[in-house]
Amino acid sequence: GVGDLIRKAVAAIKNIV
């Protein structure tokens, strides 16, 4: 769902940082 997309985006950002 939308929450999954947001969590994936947050995880991607954390991986970049």
Curated annotation (Swiss-Prot):
Keywords carried by this UniProt record: Amidation, Amphibian defense peptide, Secreted
Kindly list the positions at which Valine amide occurs in this protein.
V17
Q: Which Pfam families match?
A: Antimicrobial_8
Q: Which organism is it from?
A: Uperoleia mjobergii
Q: Which body tissues produce this protein?
A: Expressed by the skin dorsal glands.
Gene Ontology cellular-component terms for this entry are: extracellular region
Name a biological process GO annotation.
defense response
InterPro entries, per this entry?
A: Antimicrobial_8
- Its recorded name reads Uperin-3.4
Which lineage ranks, top first, belong to the organism behind this chain? Eukaryota, Metazoa, Chordata, Craniata, Vertebrata
Locations listed in the record: Secreted
Q: What is its main location?
A: secreted
